[in-house]
Curated annotation (Swiss-Prot):
Residues 24-59, 66-101, 128-163, 171-206 form the EF-hand domain. One of its GO terms (biological process) is cell projection organization. PROSITE patterns: EF_HAND_1, EF_HAND_2. This is 25 kDa calcium-binding protein. InterPro entries: Calbindin_Ca-bind, EF-hand-dom_pair, EF_Hand_1_Ca_BS, EF_hand_dom. GO terms for cellular component: cytosol; nucleus. GO terms for molecular function: calcium ion binding. The keyword Phosphoprotein does not apply. Ca(2+) 1 binds at D37, R43, D48.
């Protein structure tokens, strides 16, 4: 967390007492997010954390080359709600917490509880299929960003078909493109675990399988 405080200082924010009001903290958050959200993706990925860390150390005339473990750990610190994605809201919460002493954690926890409670309850057979999907997703989410890019999807597709007994299937670039278009519901150019799970559920439903509450019905 000390590294993050250094990042705040290196972003250009100054204060004689080291504190500001909530609006001031939001201004700092916006400045940090816009500076490090390379490509305007709407999120900060592991690769974006590298300059955040190195520039923080540089502001103290120190050189530091973060390892992959350092980068992943830093990303987890920024990811306040633990969904695998660092958004502007995550950065804003950190800025408010450490620049004003005000915490918004309770609100975020409440929102997470609402999100979890509204998630459909699937029967055990479907949950077993989703567990396999989650395991495959984690295997190919090589940078731990919680998102799959083009170069990570081909392997996921191959293993998904293998789980269905089609071990000889090798996806083409066109297959990957079509699958990405189907799965990427928010059109951000990548596929999240939630989007992948939704696609699995829709595929089961199209196959005539009842996915909620009752046992599988073919």
């Amino acid at each position: 967390m000390a590294q993050y405080s250094q990042t705040l200082r290196s972003s250009g924010f100054t204060s004689t007492v080291g504190l500001t009001d909530i609006e001031g903290a939001k201004t700092v958050a916006r400045r940090i997010f816009e500076n490090y959200d390379k490509g305007r993706k709407g999120r900060i990925e592991n690769t974006d954390c590298v300059p955040m860390i190195t520039e923080a150390y540089k502001s103290f005339n120190s050189f530091f080359a973060p390892s992959s473990d350092d980068i992943k750990a830093y990303h987890r610190v920024l990811d306040r709600n633990g969904d695998g994605i660092v958004t502007y809201q995550d950065i804003e919460e950190l800025c408010i917490r450490y620049l004003t002493g005000t915490t918004v954690q309770r609100t975020i926890v409440t929102e997470e509880k609402v999100k979890k409670s509204s998630k459909p309850k699937y029967n055990p057979e479907v949950e077993a299929k989703l567990d396999v999907a989650r395991r495959l997703f984690k295997r190919y989410d090589k940078d731990g960003s919680g998102q799959l890019q083009d170069d990570e999807i081909a392997g996921l597709l191959k293993d998904t078909y293998a789980e269905m007994g089609m071990s000889n299937f090798t996806p083409t670039k066109e297959d990957v493109k079509i699958w990405l278009q189907m799965a990427d519901t928010n059109s951000d150019g990548s596929v999240s675990l939630e989007e992948y799970e939704d696609l699995i559920i829709k595929s089961l439903q199209k196959a005539g399988i009842r996915v909620e509450k009752q046992s599988l019905v073919f």
